[in-house]
């Protein structure tokens, strides 16, 4: 993928200083400045006790640069309010759809942001390798928070050559299929429990509704310079399901090649859906229309009754039109993208990571805040429409108001099933955020063959 962060629609630049959302009421206008590392365990009292260790940061400004843009940017901006009120600092937020390219342009020009949300660990490795003097190792407070509130694997994703740089931020579950509960009920369709049942359901929809022009699936992979990432998620989900977690992890490190028969078999299964003109692209167009449809719009034909299913991550909840009821009995909901057997339930997921590019106390404090339970719970409360979760164990699931977020959190916290972190996010940036996206787009837009695509991606691996 591409991560959770390539999915965003327009550029948004805003300061959260003037926002009116009150997530926490601070106990004093001028916080005390006691010693501490910023690793408080949370505050239920609504005061600034958990923020005291950050010190008095009045008059200080921290700039944040991300690829998260409207409509997903506002909850992030709102979630900074408690930190601003309790420390006196101001957070200046900038989101850009061209983040992946522009961050490196800014680093080359010496115009680095204080904080950046890195959507791919592979990109983090690239930045550390190319700009070692620009990026700053994570603060002690940040490191302590991650040790306490996250599984060890998450810290590993933000570590390069033994040095910890970037703390996890949000997390997401990719293994979802969005659908209309009422459309399923009206047609007597049941939620598939295996991959074969999913294909059988798709064939049943073609038989029942093909003559009406209604398709089983609708999709879009457009995302500016990150176009193609939704298609990579499809392949990752199928590799994880068909080949298993061991092959999946070896694929990430290039021990298993892109043109390995196991990866080719998974791509064949993806093509049986996305390149099947009987299956796609409901309410939008032909197979090639998938490449020109923005990912935000890819699932909307479900609401018009023109398609039945849309495979997309938990964060897609934020892209349904205002007023859409996202629940088991609502306008739309999601079911788990089934495994090959009913007992096999691997989960594909991803997340963003917070890196610092300035060694100042206010920057270290804000990075620590973003790794804390205080921020995770503030962010959950600031996202009333849903579409966001975290792997932070300090997150109270009661603060997740959306049924899909609660379902996601339950999957993220289920250690009995294999969890595969988004493969392209862990690959080198030129592959995971480069050739993989581009070739999957050409696979659809230009009808390149499976072999051509897989060989081209493999050739790009340096």
Each language-model region and where it sits:
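Extracytoplasmic/periplasmic substrate-recognition and gating elements
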Residues: 309-315, 321-387
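Short, well-ordered beta-strand elements
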Residues: 47, 58-69, 89-94, 115, ...
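Glycine-centered hinge/linker elements that transmit conformational signals in sensory
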Residues: 252-288
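Extracytoplasmic "Venus flytrap"/periplasmic binding protein-like
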Residues: 79-152, 182-193, 301, 308-309, ...
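C-terminal capping/gating helix-and-loop segments adjacent to ligand/active sites or protein-protein/ligand interfaces
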Residues: 386-391, 406-461
């Amino acid at each position: 993928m591409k991560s959770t962060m390539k999915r965003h629609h327009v550029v948004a630049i805003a300061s959260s200083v003037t926002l009116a959302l009150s997530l926490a009421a601070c106990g004093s206008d001028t916080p005390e400045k006691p010693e501490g590392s910023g690793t408080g365990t949370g505050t239920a009292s609504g005061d600034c006790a958990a923020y005291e260790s950050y010190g008095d940061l009045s008059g200080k400004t921290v700039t944040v640069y991300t690829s998260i843009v409207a409509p997903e940017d506002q909850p992030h901006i709102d979630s900074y309010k408690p930190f601003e009120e309790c420390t006196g600092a101001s957070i200046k937020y900038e989101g850009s759809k061209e983040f992946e390219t522009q961050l490196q342009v800014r680093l080359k020009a010496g115009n680095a942001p204080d904080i950046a949300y890195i959507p791919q660990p592979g990109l983090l490795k690239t930045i550390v390798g190319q700009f070692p003097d620009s990026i700053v190792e994570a603060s002690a407070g940040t490191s302590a928070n991650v040790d306490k509130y996250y599984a060890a694997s998450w810290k590993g994703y933000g570590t390069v050559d033994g040095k910890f740089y970037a703390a996890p931020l949000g997390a997401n579950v990719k293994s979802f299929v969005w659908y209309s509960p009422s459309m399923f009920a009206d047609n007597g369709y049941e939620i598939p429990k295996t991959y074969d049942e999913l294909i059988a359901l798709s064939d049943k929809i073609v038989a029942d509704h093909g003559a009406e022009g209604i398709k089983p699936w609708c999709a879009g992979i457009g995302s500016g310079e990150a176009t193609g990432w939704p298609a990579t998620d499809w392949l990752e989900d199928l590799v994880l399901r068909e080949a298993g977690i061991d092959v999946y992890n070896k694929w990430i490190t290039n021990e298993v090649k892109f043109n390995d028969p196991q990866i080719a078999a998974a791509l064949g299964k993806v093509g049986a859906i996305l390149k099947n003109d009987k299956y796609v692209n409901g309410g939008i167009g032909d197979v090639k229309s998938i490449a020109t449809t923005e990912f935000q719009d890819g699932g909307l034909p479900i609401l018009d009754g023109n398609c039945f299913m849309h495979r997309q991550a938990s964060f897609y909840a934020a892209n349904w039109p205002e007023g859409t009821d996202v629940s088991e009995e609502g306008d739309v909901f999601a079911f788990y993208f089934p495994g090959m057997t009913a007992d096999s339930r691997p989960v594909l997921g991803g997340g963003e990571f917070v890196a610092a590019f300035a060694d100042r106390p206010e920057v270290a404090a804000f990075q620590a805040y973003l790794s804390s339970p205080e921020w995770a719970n503030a962010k959950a409360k600031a996202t009333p429409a849903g579409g966001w979760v975290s792997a932070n164990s300090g997150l109270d699931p009661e603060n997740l108001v959306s049924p899909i977020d609660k379902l996601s959190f339950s999957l993220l916290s289920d250690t009995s099933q294999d969890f595969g972190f988004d493969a392209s996010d862990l690959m080198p940036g030129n592959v995971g955020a480069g050739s993989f996206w581009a070739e999957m787009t050409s696979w659809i837009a230009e009808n390149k063959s499976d072999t051509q695509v897989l060989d081209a991606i493999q050739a790009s691996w340096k």
